[in-house]
Amino acid sequence: MSTTSLQHFPHSYSPFSSSRSLNRMAQSQTSGLDTLAEGSQYALEQLQMSREAAGSGEATDSVGKPKDQFQVDNDNHHNNHSLSNFKNPSQRDPLVEARSTIRKNSASAPVRRRISRACDQCNQLRTKCDGQNPCAHCIDFGLTCEYARERKKRGKASKKDLAAAAAAAAAAATNSGQPNGSSGKEDAALVGGHTSPDRRPTINGRYDPAFEVPRNLNGSAQHSEASGMVGMQNSQHLPPHSQSSMGGGLEGLPLNGYNGLNDSGRPSMPVPELQSLHMLHNSHTNPRSPSSILPHHRYNGGYNDSAYSLMNPQEPNSTSISHFRLGSSTENPPNSFLGLSPPAQSPGWLPLPSPSPANFPSFSMASFSTTLRYPVLHPVLPHIASIIPQSLACDLLDVYFTSSSSSHLSPQSPYVVGYIFRKQSFLHPTKPRVCTPGLLASMLWVAAQTSDAPFLTSPPSARGRVCQKLLELTIGLLRPLIHGPAPGETSPNYAANMVINGVALGGFGVSMDQLGAQSSATGAVDDVATYVHLATVISASEYKAASMRWWTAAWSLARELKLGRELPPNTPHARPDAERDGDPDADLSKRHPPPLITSMGHGPGNTIINITEEEREERRRLWWLLYATDRHLALCYNRPLTLLDKECEGLLQPMNDDLWQAGDFATYRQAGPPVECTGHSMFGYFLPLMTILGEIVDLQQARNHPRFGLAFRNSAECEAQVLEIARQLDVYAQSLKEFETRYTSSLALGAAETEAAMDGSHPNHVSPSGRSSSTVESRVNESIVHTKMVVAYGTHIMHVLHILLAGKWDPINLLDDNDLWISSESFVAAMGHAVGAAEAAAEILEYDPDLSFMPFFFGIYLLQGSFLLLLTADKLQGDASPSVVRACETIVRAHEACVVTLNTEYQRTFRKVMRSALAQVRGRLPEDFGEQQQRRREVLALYRWTGDGSGLAL
């Protein structure tokens, strides 16, 4: 068929020419063909058939039409004639007659109509939607019902429209110096967005106000919108199958045979929403922004209906139009962000790989116009708009900072091992902390692992899908810290494969410009915290070996940032934020004490950065968290230490969590790694134990040295180190007793005095103060229980460290007992600590039945404290003492609780092993006793702590 005969097709099936023709089209479509109605060629054929079947009805439809409408009808007649070259109408006469018979027989039946569009929630969940706002499904599940996603359409754009668009763009460039009034009118006429009232767009004969959004803008806004879309087809005013003609006369432009790309029908962005996105305009200056990775000398940022300009880049006239046509360059700076993804596969003449959701996120425009509960999320909103609703993002941020106790801060999420940031700084309604999008995405990902939001629980697969997308987004936003391929070697699926390889096989490299003048100290700290979030969740999964890559990246970056050193003292002069002193709404914690001026970065390009006391404390807490996990994972995976005590001997110890969250920064604290229990948080009771564990790990590595280990084990130096570590454990035990006395006896005494005062002052009636006394008493009781729980956990881990100090970490070596250690005094002392650890585990189960207080850390200490009990049960069997039997029962209960809270393979495996041994202790010997012993040995052989063993990292 000829190209000339097809250039007028958009005129012939414009749905706004007549409302009656639309009704006839809807009635002529049978239910069996509804699914085909979205094809553009099928729409042409059905329109032609319906007009032929209508016959003389066309004459009556023309009554009362305006003059321009007659012109459209004449064009339609001409197009009908030109269609004969495309397909002979006589060949479809039997089909027309058959469909006419079907319409007559089904005239009495109700017309089946499909909804034009499902809401965003139903579309994402693949759920049937009734098309209402809000729809029934969103009402039932309490979801936010929105119709904010982009409209997409099938088929190619008309060559005539594309040529008109290119000509209009060129005309706009030449007429840019005209007065605003004349240019605005011409642009409005070209865009076609301002029609007379009698020609307003309708759908099925009804006026739809959604198409009239640009009419509500003021004059300047209309002009800015029209100038940004000059010569372009304003397709948000049309249904997906319609395109309006822009005029001819441009057939001579060099299109080189390209007929166009899929027009996605994206709505234009209202002007007020552009103002709400001002924080994205500087993304090209942020080296962490994914869009900054793209070459931007030929691209324009923004939005429009056309995905690409179709001019050949090699043509001489292609300089001004052979680039992305995503909006007006006057509204957005070049390459501010590429919010709308290109088609799945870019054309061959455009050298771009297929984008991944992480690097080219889709935008939901309506979400930015609503009020954001937590403004801290602004940097990440453009990236998560197509993943989760805005309200859910705020809820997930609440989940991240939720505490399981009202008396003392304790993270409820098992993947938040300690609070690095202040809750008030993140959730501040007006002046939140400035965060990188990667950190925010990782926080949402961590919270989504355990959130009970309906969006994540219905259907059951929703959580996995959302968490996977958030993980890909987080890794994509950290791309500057991950090695990319060499130029020219990028495959179309590299961005997607990078996510999988980043978790399992990917390498990491630190970009030095991230640590120099182009990056703030907060941004660099945010990157380390993002790695911590990723590593923590992966460590708790079955991919423990893969998590070491993320931990190594976090440790290396923390060392390069020198987080283990204190920054220089405050400088009293030069206060850049002094103008905020008179602001009553400013966050006082940001200004107290005065900030310091320090030099960050490397080399001569150092920059002066303002560091507040809060940012100093964030650096300290991040280092101490990495310090503790380094020692914890050294035990888990049988590896040497990475962060040394020498690197942080001058670093102040972290603050008390309650004071930290309240913004009460302490002026005096001790420096260096702690060895005494000081508080209820991980930094207060667990960090001192990890300091001692680091000494034990160094001692164990020296004992197992392949060349010097034997001489060291028999030397006096080894004995001296053992005695010193034992002394440190005794110091910790004493501090634990003082901690319990301070937070239980004093609180109980204070509560009793308060109750007595209330009883003496109000003997006959209950006052508000009397009613509040019950609340105070409950808070005191909760604080006492929380303190006892901390003491129980600390006691258990302390006993396990005594066992580890003896040097017997490997379960197979214990069962073999080649050195007859079971008959030594050291074994008797270690066995006493094993029973003490089991008794402490019983107290833990009393105060924390589901072991949810510290599930990420507790598993390995429960396991190492159980090996000696397993050895005793295996050797003594029915002759074991009652205390050993009770200890084995407690260990089995504790492992079952651990499996429920944070399910991991090694805990499930060891629970079966302990159950089998406990049955033998009770005298229930199976027939295949030897086979069961061999099976237990094979299972335990998976987890080795010998010289070449990898512990839990299978």
Swiss-Prot record:
Residues 8-21 have a biased composition (Low complexity). GO terms for cellular component: nucleus. SUPFAM superfamilies: Zn2/Cys6 DNA-binding domain (SSF57701). It is found in: Nucleus. Residues 22-33, 82-91, 174-183, 764-777 have a biased composition (Polar residues). Keywords: Activator, DNA-binding, Metal-binding, Nucleus, Transcription, Transcription regulation, Zinc. Residues 1-39, 51-93, 173-226, 310-333, 566-607, 758-777 are annotated as: Disordered. Residues 64-78, 574-590 have a biased composition (Basic and acidic residues). Its main location: nucleus. GO terms for molecular function: DNA binding; DNA-binding transcription factor activity, RNA polymerase II-specific; zinc ion binding. It comes from the Eukaryota. Pfam families: Fungal_trans (PF04082), Zn_clus (PF00172). The keyword Metal-binding applies. InterPro entries: Transcription_factor_dom_fun, XlnR/Xlr1, Zn2-C6_fun-type_DNA-bd_sf, Zn2Cys6_DnaBD. Transcriptional activator of the xylanolytic system. Involved in the regulation of extracellular cellulolytic and xylanolytic genes and in the regulation of the intracellular activities of D-xylose catabolic genes in the pentose catabolic pathway (PCP) in response to the presence of D-xylose. Belongs to the xlnR/xlr1 family. This is Xylanolytic transcriptional activator xlnR. The gene is xlnR.
